[in-house]
């Protein structure tokens, strides 16, 4: 529960970016820098906490994270300047940086190796639901009527909101205050209730040996392990591919301003509900479950690199669907599509809107199918004492890609006044580049899986000897 509240941090901030910009008299170039810096700091502390996760009790890291985050967001109430928000967001980034390695490490030690992709998919669903709740919760305090603001550029709309809605600008702080107090209470409770699972107890070759409560997995990460991690080529290709997340980082950062300022509709509009419905059906069901289950099944049938193959296929198939969706560029204020080139009536708008939502939903499904299989592959390709660290390294590189998307996107949107064009070209360029780093995994993973499995078999024999003693 505590982890779910902490990971709500960004989903609370992103829906109310327009309010934040209007409140603090800034524009999307400053917002982009803020989101980018947050992502980088978050990534740095993911690496630090990944190492700490492999070395110390994860319960302690979770509690520290809870206290830092809750104290930080409660003090958002007193922010009046951009620099204050910047510092506070960096502290929040530190706190959220602890959650990824702790979560992945917990799941790896609580769920059978054969079903890891499915377990990560379930966690993805739970965290997605938490994010949606956080966004809806944040938007419930935002009463700006975006549909009434038409015929203005993005920056002019922000100025209009600042001038005409002065009594509503502070409301972006309220959801943070309420969730911060809740997190503070839950963190205190977790000191007494959280249980630490046994490391390695769900691995295929260690499960039997570690079923004895007297036998513990005593291997700990050493600093010298880091140079050995990347002797396995699969780790290199799985972790350095930041191109894969540049476009998604941009989309995630600006999805709400894109809907409110460029498409020109309120987030609670029926058309947005249709969009979310398609994204939920295709993205969560097909992406998080069907594709994750497919990866698990391939491994269970003896294809040790099956999850990697599914991730590669997803990375390729996501491109055409997202490119078609963002090329449609709907605008509800003047009933047009394709960058104002095609004007339609109300019926035509709904038909094309559903087509747009379908392409976007299928594209998101393949995008979301990558995550569970990627995490599972990283876990399977590394020893239990190294998993938190390798996931942290991969997440840090991801954060670089996402921050690039947010920062570049902020400046490009500020210059071009177009979210659609910015997202379209970033998806095309960085999507093609990422494919070149996915394909080599077809050839590197079988050898690396065999290497790890042989080590775990040997350790299993050693642990069985401990049981006899």
Report each predicted region and the residues it spans.
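Extracytoplasmic gate region of multi-pass secondary transporters
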Residues: 13-14, 232-284, 288, 371, ...
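Juxtamembrane intracellular "pre-TM" segments in multi-pass secondary transporters
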Residues: 197-239, 262-265, 343-346, 457-467
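Extracytoplasmic
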Residues: 1-28, 251-256
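Helix-loop-helix hairpin linking two adjacent transmembrane segments in secondary transporters
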Residues: 123-194
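Conserved MFS/SLC helix-loop-helix module at the cytosolic interface between two early adjacent transmembrane helices
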Residues: 44-83
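Residue-level signature of mid-helix packing/kink "hotspots" within the transmembrane helices
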Residues: 11, 39-47, 131-132, 281-289, ...
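Structural signature of the two symmetry-related core transmembrane helices
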Residues: 60-74, 305-323
């Amino acid at each position: 529960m505590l982890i779910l509240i902490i990971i709500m941090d960004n989903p609370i901030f992103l829906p109310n970016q327009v309010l934040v910009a209007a409140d603090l008299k800034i524009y999307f170039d400053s917002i982009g820098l803020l989101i980018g810096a947050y992502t980088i700091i978050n990534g740095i502390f993911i690496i630090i906490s990944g190492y700490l996760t492999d070395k110390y009790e994860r319960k302690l890291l979770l509690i520290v994270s809870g206290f830092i985050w809750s104290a930080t967001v409660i003090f958002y109430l007193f922010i009046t300047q951009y620099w204050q928000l910047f510092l506070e967001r960096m502290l929040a980034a530190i706190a959220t940086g602890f959650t990824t390695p702790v979560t992945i490490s917990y799941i790896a030690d609580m769920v059978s190796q054969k079903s890891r992709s499915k377990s990560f998919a379930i966690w993805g669903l739970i965290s997605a639901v938490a994010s949606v709740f956080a966004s809806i919760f944040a938007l419930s305090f935002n009463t700006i009527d975006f549909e009434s603001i038409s015929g203005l550029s993005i920056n002019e709309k922000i100025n209009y909101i600042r001038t005409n809605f002065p009594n509503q600008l502070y409301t972006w702080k309220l959801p943070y205050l309420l969730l911060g107090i809740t997190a503070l209470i839950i963190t205190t409770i977790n000191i007494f209730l959280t249980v630490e699972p046994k490391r390695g107890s769900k691995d295929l070759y260690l499960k039997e040996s570690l079923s004895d409560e007297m036998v513990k997995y005593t291997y700990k990460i050493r600093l010298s392990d880091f140079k050995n991690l990347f002797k396995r080529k699969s780790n290199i290709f799985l972790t350095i591919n930041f191109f894969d997340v540049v476009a998604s980082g941009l989309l995630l950062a600006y999805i709400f301003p894109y809907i409110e300022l460029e498409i020109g509709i309120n987030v609670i509009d029926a058309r947005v509900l249709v969009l979310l419905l398609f994204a939920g059906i295709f993205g969560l069901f097909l992406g998080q479950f069907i594709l994750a289950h497919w990866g698990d099944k391939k491994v269970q049938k003896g294809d040790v690199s099956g999850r990697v193959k599914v991730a590669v296929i997803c990375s390729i198939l996501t491109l055409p669907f997202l490119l078609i969706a963002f090329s449609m560029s709907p605008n509800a204020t003047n009933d047009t599509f394709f960058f104002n080139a095609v004007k339609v009536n109300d019926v035509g708008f709904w038909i094309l809107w559903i087509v747009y939502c379908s392409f976007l939903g299928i594209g998101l499904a393949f995008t979301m199918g990558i995550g569970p299989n990627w995490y599972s592959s990283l876990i399977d390709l590394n020893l239990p004492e190294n998993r938190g660290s390798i996931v942290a390294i991969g997440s840090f590189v991801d954060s670089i890609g996402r921050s690039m998307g947010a920062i570049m996107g902020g400046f490009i949107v500020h210059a071009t006044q177009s979210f659609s064009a910015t997202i379209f070209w970033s998806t095309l360029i960085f999507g093609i580049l990422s494919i070149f780093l996915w394909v080599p995994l077809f050839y590197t993973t079988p050898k690396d899986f065999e290497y790890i499995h042989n080590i775990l078999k040997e350790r299993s024999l050693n642990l069985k000897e401990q049981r006899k003693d």
